[in-house]
Regions:
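Short, conserved beta-strand element in jelly-roll/cupin
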Residues: 51-68
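Short strand-coil-strand connectors
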Residues: 26, 69-73, 94-96
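A short, N-terminal "cap"/entry segment at the start of jelly-roll beta-barrel domains
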Residues: 1-42, 49, 116, 121-126
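Ligand-binding loop in jelly-roll beta-barrel domains
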Residues: 87-112
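Short acidic-glycine-tyrosine-enriched beta hairpin
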Residues: 70-89
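Short, surface-exposed beta-edge/turn micro-motifs
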Residues: 28, 55-56, 88, 97
Length: 126
């Protein structure tokens, strides 16, 4: 596939508070994320290295607000802003946030599998 849109995305993952629609482009995942309710990923990242996301992400926020915490600071990303999240971040978003994100496919798949397992252990899996 050489292109992907929210509507054409072949993969849909429902996390409860959020829905990801995505596809792959030459080793990178392209994910369109819709946040349905305020969601802080702190609990679902506990147990991963550093209790944070080990996968880098590049992206663009189209609506809402995304707050990204690091060990020594936090950043707020708002509509119209592009971002880079290096490994070691903990994101939180308000309801109504929409973004598109690009991540190395293999790293993202490993992180998502670990996150889903942690959510199931915590009784939050869908």
């Amino acid at each position: 596939m050489s292109k992907v849109s929210r509507e054409s995305a072949p993969d849909v993952t429902d996390y409860g508070p959020a829905e990801d629609r995505g596809g792959q482009l030459d080793g990178y995942a392209v994910i369109f994320t819709s946040i349905r309710e305020d969601w802080d990923l702190t609990p679902v990242l506990k147990g991963l290295p550093g209790d944070s996301c080990p996968c880098p992400h590049w992206g663009y926020v189209t609506a809402g607000r995304l707050t990204v915490r690091y060990g020594d600071h936090e950043e707020v990303i708002e509509p119209g802003e592009a971002f880079y999240m290096p490994p070691g971040h903990v994101p939180a978003a308000v309801a109504g946030t929409e973004l598109v994100m690009f991540s190395p496919q293999d790293e993202l798949a490993a992180m998502e599998a670990a996150m889903r397992e942690l959510m199931m252990q915590q009784g939050n899996g869908n």
